[in-house]
């Protein structure tokens, strides 16, 4: 041991346990442009002061452990430690606080969501001194976001590939989600695309099961979309789910999709994992494939208000890891999603620069610089009567995806697709004429149904179907 090292390691070291706040609570700290900033919702155990709880989060998600260690003297804690720099009580909640933590950029591997999350949402979430812990938001500095490729292509490139502008895109998840043979599955794909949809989709749990192996499904779906393209003169796509049990198998499926000449593949990014997702996103950019992302398992992580991680963080992570579409709730359908909160993370997916706005749950200003945007997908319990609201809420840069709302049409799959396309075109035309879809939406649909029997039949079937439940994901 050199004299210099010996002195650094031994001078000032005192074994034992001391409060986290003595080292990691630094309210005087001025955050840097290069810091990664986190907003945690912290519920301390009884008797634990908020300063100690906040400092514990900063410590256990960065350089700290439960006791002092002599190896602290071999490095510069001031350079590498996370810092709890602000604490504010949550209005209306007893013993709950928003804790702000700043992390030095050098704590994280470049271009790795996996490494970022392993630290910030790792073991600290099981820390006994906390009753509950939720990550509400992250500020990703450009110095870090620029180390990621991001989405394979982005919104503008996708529109150019599809030659479709000025309206939301239409999709449909093939149902029943499990049990169809590959040929019957392909038939449903063809009928929906021929009827006017832009995309059809594998359900998230369709991988390669005994009733339908992946290669058979890929072949029949490719045949269906090329036939529909020839008949309609429009570019069509089917989200071929490449998710698999190993990264090697996932990549093999993506390669086969490219060889078939289809425009888009799909991945379940949370169950598949960020490492696999980032690898697939890089392949998709290099080989001209669009990448649709499903968020299966997200509600396990994000639905509880006081513990876990808000979906806006998962959305930011996906934009960095890579995806051209991601499911983002509907506001009006069967799945969870409060309007202002949903639109907050929709903006975080699509826009280049998003201002801090606590009324929408956005804790930090986020500058994505030149990273491409992600198209939000509205899917889950929606039908033709929802079309005006969806068009008004999500705007043109979105995918509106009707599964049961297409395949449940009383006349069949193709008429279901026709009904949705007519409803969408009517809403876009009405909006472009200056009509208020929020107030006049039902009238727009009724007018369009007079000259579309397919839409009229859909309107009759679903005229009383609503999903009225109290939203859990509120501010």
UniProtKB/Swiss-Prot annotation:
Modified residues (N-acetylproline): 3
Modification after translation, per record: The disulfide bond which can form in the large chain dimeric partners within the hexadecamer appears to be associated with oxidative stress and protein turnover.
SUPFAM superfamilies: RuBisCo, C-terminal domain (SSF51649), RuBisCO, large subunit, small (N-terminal) domain (SSF54966)
Catalytic activity: 2 (2R)-3-phosphoglycerate + 2 H(+) = D-ribulose 1,5-bisphosphate + CO2 + H2O; D-ribulose 1,5-bisphosphate + O2 = 2-phosphoglycolate + (2R)-3-phosphoglycerate + 2 H(+)
Keywords, in A-Z order: Acetylation, Calvin cycle, Carbon dioxide fixation, Chloroplast, Disulfide bond, Lyase, Magnesium, Metal-binding, Methylation, Monooxygenase, Oxidoreductase, Photorespiration, Photosynthesis, Plastid
Location relative to the cell: Plastid, Chloroplast
Known EC number: 4.1.1.39
Keyword Oxidoreductase: yes
PROSITE patterns: RUBISCO_LARGE (PS00157)
Cofactor, how bound (note): Binds 1 Mg(2+) ion per subunit.
Functional description taken from the UniProt entry: RuBisCO catalyzes two reactions: the carboxylation of D-ribulose 1,5-bisphosphate, the primary event in carbon dioxide fixation, as well as the oxidative fragmentation of the pentose substrate in the photorespiration process. Both reactions occur simultaneously and in competition at the same active site.
Protein name: Ribulose bisphosphate carboxylase large chain
Species of provenance: Afrocarpus gracilior (African fern pine)
